[in-house]
């Protein structure tokens, strides 16, 4: 089976790199997208979600990502996002605290001038981190 390289990059640098991927699954704005070697060149907007990388032997890596873009070429996928964490690096307790804070902000009185869009994004990020951490 042909292999595919993937790199996940944030403004702070490369977070994840793999050169032997068999399948990469991305959460795009239009739905889940599976990418294998030889995929047609594409640029896809990503939503908050998990990137799943299947390696030889059916080993899988899971990476929680925020919104961003994926540039897909026949032998390479470049994921550009604001933040990303590998499942092994996620502090579940910290993610649960973030979830509680986001829920509290969303439940505040509208007179408090809460930025609901920002609070909702924080809620989705926290939920995603907790879900991805389950794959450690």
Swiss-Prot record:
Keywords: ATP synthesis, Cell membrane, CF(1), Hydrogen ion transport, Ion transport, Membrane, Transport. The keyword Membrane applies. It is found in: Cell membrane. It comes from the Bacteria. InterPro entries: ATP_F1_dsu/esu_C_sf, ATP_synth_F1_dsu/esu, ATP_synth_F1_dsu/esu_N, ATP_synth_F1_esu_C, ATPsynth_dsu/esu_N. One of its GO terms (molecular function) is proton-transporting ATP synthase activity, rotational mechanism. One of its GO terms (cellular component) is proton-transporting ATP synthase complex. Pfam families: ATP-synt_DE, ATP-synt_DE_N. Transmembrane segments: none annotated. It is a peripheral membrane protein. HAMAP family: ATP_synth_epsil_bac (MF_00530). F-type ATPases have 2 components, CF(1) - the catalytic core - and CF(0) - the membrane proton channel. CF(1) has five subunits: alpha(3), beta(3), gamma(1), delta(1), epsilon(1). CF(0) has three main subunits: a, b and c. Belongs to the ATPase epsilon chain family. Produces ATP from ADP in the presence of a proton gradient across the membrane. This is ATP synthase epsilon chain. The gene is atpC.
């Amino acid at each position: 089976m042909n292999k595919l390289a993937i790199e996940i990059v944030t403004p702070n640098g490369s977070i994840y790199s793999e050169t032997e991927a068999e399948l990469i699954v991305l959460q795009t704005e239009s739905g889940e997208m599976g990418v294998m070697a030889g995929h047609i060149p594409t640029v896809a907007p990503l939503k908050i979600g998990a990137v799943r990388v299947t390696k030889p032997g059916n080993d899988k890596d899971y990476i929680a990502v925020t919104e961003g873009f994926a540039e897909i070429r026949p032998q390479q996928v470049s994921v550009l996002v604001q933040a990303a964490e590998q499942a092994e690096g996620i502090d579940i307790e910290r993610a649960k605290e973030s979830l509680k804070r986001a829920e509290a902000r969303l439940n505040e009185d509208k007179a408090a001038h809460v930025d609901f869009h920002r609070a909702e994004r924080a809620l989705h990020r926290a939920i995603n981190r907790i879900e991805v951490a389950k794959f450690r």
